[in-house]
A protein has these predicted regions:
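C-terminal motif of bacterial Sec signal peptides marking the signal peptidase cleavage site
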Residues: 16-19
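Beta/alpha (TIM)-barrel catalytic core signal, keyed to glycine-rich beta->alpha loops juxtaposed to Asp/Glu
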Residues: 181-342
Length: 342
């Protein structure tokens, strides 16, 4: 009897264990299927980002160096700083004219101011900037200030940089450029600007009046920081296309001094039949057509003026655009003719 009872209990335990194993296998299979489904759903959902994430990725894409943003009126320099593409030049402006012109340029929304030690008006530029800041028109960070080191200062570039900072009344200068090619000592002057970048005194550095590709390359090969900008005489009759193509390989952008042709020469361009015809079609002035051409062609423009009305006119070039045909007709005006001999 005891043997029968023991056999019965043993069989019962065997059947119970078998049942548990079957249930465990079933649950494991169910969990595996569920995990597989979740994995598939996850893979399918990862094929496409949500719209918000896609937009976020789009908005964080880096801005391409040297490409003009005509909507915001800026260009990203190879130094990593954004620069306005239209501004005010101050060549030949007296102290009072300069201060008034810079103030009105800032008042009208301009944020690029160009001066130079040799112009003798850096202090006036500084006063106008401080006035605009004090009146809440803009902040220092919103203004892009360019000045230039004159050739006689190349022997002691470090002192020249400090002197410009003091005259401008600024803690840093957005862009300093060598005013002219001078092979005897421009490399040393440029190296002084490189040191000033490392010290936080300058943010970007560049060149002016280098018209020969070999001359530009000479300085680049002897220095460390590639010029962010080359400022040359550039206008519709002297478009500097070959030089611009050459410096583009370095990520260097072209800036035009005398973008309207220069004092004593502007009327020649203003009266050009092609320019007049396009101006009439857009109900704009010849100056506005020329400046718009510069921006669409990839030239930063710094027209000078002591007349607040003209300053406002020069800045008001973002409410229209030139067609491809109009750009081609204007580009065809190139005569490779310089009006100044610097």
């Amino acid at each position: 009897m005891k043997k029968l009872l023991s056999l019965f209990l043993t069989l019962t335990m065997i059947f119970s264990l078998a049942a548990c194993g079957t249930q465990a296998d079933t649950e494991s299979s169910s969990e595996s299927t569920s995990a597989s489904q979740q994995s598939t759903e996850s893979a399918e959902s990862s094929d496409e980002l949500p719209a918000s994430e896609e937009n976020s990725a789009e908005s964080t894409r880096p801005v391409e160096t040297g490409v003009f943003d005509l909507e915001n009126g800026t260009v990203m320099l190879n130094s990593g700083y954004e620069m306005p593409i239209i501004g005010l030049g101050t060549f030949r402006l007296s102290d009072s004219e300069c201060e008034n012109s810079v103030y009105h340029a800032l008042l009208y929304g301009g944020r690029l101011i160009d001066t130079a030690r040799i112009y003798g008006n850096e202090e006036a530029v500084g006063r106008a900037i401080q006035r605009a800041i004090d009146e809440g028109i803009c902040t220092r960070e919103e203004i892009f200030v360019t000045t230039k080191m004159w050739t006689s200062d190349y022997e002691d570039g470090d002192a020249a940089i400090d002197a410009s900072l003091e005259r401008l009344g600024l803690d840093y200068i957005d862009l300093m450029i060598l005013h002219h090619s001078q092979p005897s000592n421009d490399v040393e002057a440029y190296q002084a600007m490189e040191r000033a970048v490392a010290d936080g005194k300058l943010r970007s550095i560049g060149l002016s009046n280098y018209y020969d590709p070999e001359d530009f390359d000479r300085l680049v090969e002897a220095t460390t920081i590639v010029p962010a900008l080359l400022q040359n005489e550039t206008h519709l009759y002297h478009q500097s296309r070959e030089m611009k193509e050459h410096i583009a390989q370095y990520g260097t952008v072209m800036e035009s001094w005398f973008p309207l042709g220069g004092r004593g020469q502007t009327q020649i361009l203003f009266d050009d039949p092609t320019i007049v015809s396009i101006a009439e079609a857009h109900d704009k002035t010849s100056a506005q057509i020329i400046l718009r051409w510069h921006l669409q062609a990839g030239n930063i423009a710094i027209p000078g003026s002591s007349n607040p009305d003209h300053i406002l006119e020069n800045l008001s070039i973002f409410d229209f655009s030139l067609s491809d045909e109009e750009m081609e007709n204007l580009t065809a005006l190139d005569r490779k003719e310089r009006f100044a001999d610097y």
